[in-house]
């Protein structure tokens, strides 16, 4: 008899624990259901990188003096500097400069120690390619300035979509009753788009119709 009661008590305790754990899991799920979406719809939306973001390296051929400081400070000796000695001027003459971004760790040492500031970090991070050899950028490819996220016409930044009300930086700290909170990008654009103005053709038609009515 006591064994049966003990089994019933253990079963009841296990059932209560299971219900409590299930309720805790659902509470976390319901809490996230009340929050607005924060997923960036890449590539149509992009986050603006920080000012000190270490992206693809930009290289200025005219400033380089072929000192090879970037090669010495690189942890993996990555930059390849091709130069010849000009016997007339007794100075190095740069022929080619290349960096393989398939191997680069973007530590920024080359940019930090360059004496002529011919190297700089950009905000470009889209370096995916089907062929790893195409990631080996020469001085021509390194000299191209990337298109900024803020000026790319194919990208609408999150700030322009007005996901967050003015003055708000934390997406989870915004009340659900605030204007535009939790709306989709299409809905936000509808609220921001001004109404269409009547064209001159329509105005002419309306004026002619009014004259006919007066006649």
UniProtKB/Swiss-Prot annotation:
Protein name from the UniProt record: NAD(P)H-quinone oxidoreductase subunit I
GO function terms (MF aspect): 4 iron, 4 sulfur cluster binding; iron ion binding; NADH dehydrogenase (ubiquinone) activity; quinone binding
Cellular component aspect of the GO annotation: plasma membrane-derived thylakoid membrane
Originating organism: Synechococcus sp. (strain CC9605)
Main function: NDH-1 shuttles electrons from an unknown electron donor, via FMN and iron-sulfur (Fe-S) centers, to quinones in the respiratory and/or the photosynthetic chain. The immediate electron acceptor for the enzyme in this species is believed to be plastoquinone. Couples the redox reaction to proton translocation, and thus conserves the redox energy in a proton gradient.
Binding site for [4Fe-4S] cluster 2: 74, 104, 107, 110
Family: Belongs to the complex I 23 kDa subunit family.
Compartments reported by the entry: Cellular thylakoid membrane
UniProt GO BP: photosynthesis, light reaction
EC number: 7.1.1.-
Residues where [4Fe-4S] cluster 1 binds: 64, 67, 70, 114
This protein's record includes keyword Membrane: yes
Gene that produces this protein: ndhI
Keyword presence, Lipid metabolism: no
């Amino acid at each position: 008899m006591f064994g049966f009661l003990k089994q019933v008590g253990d079963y009841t305790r296990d059932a209560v624990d299971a219900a409590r754990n299930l309720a805790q899991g659902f509470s976390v799920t319901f809490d996230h259901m009340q929050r607005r979406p924060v997923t960036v719809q890449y590539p149509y939306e992009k986050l603006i990188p920080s000012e000190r973001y270490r992206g693809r390296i930009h290289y200025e051929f005219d400033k380089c003096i072929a000192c090879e400081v970037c090669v010495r400070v690189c942890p993996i000796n990555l930059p390849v500097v091709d130069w010849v000695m000009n016997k007339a001027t007794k100075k190095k003459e740069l022929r080619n400069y290349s960096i393989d971004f398939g191997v680069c760790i973007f530590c920024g040492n080359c940019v930090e120690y360059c004496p002529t500031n011919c190297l700089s970090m950009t905000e470009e991070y889209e370096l995916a390619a089907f062929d790893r050899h195409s990631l080996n950028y020469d001085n021509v490819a390194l000299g191209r300035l990337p298109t900024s996220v803020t000026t790319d016409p194919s990208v609408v930044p999150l700030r322009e979509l007005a996901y967050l009300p003015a003055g708000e930086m934390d997406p989870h700290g915004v009340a659900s009753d605030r204007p535009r909170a939790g709306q989709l990008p299409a809905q936000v654009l509808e609220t921001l788009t001004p109404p269409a103005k009547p064209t001159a053709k329509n105005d002419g038609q309306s004026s002619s119709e009014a004259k006919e009515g007066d006649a």
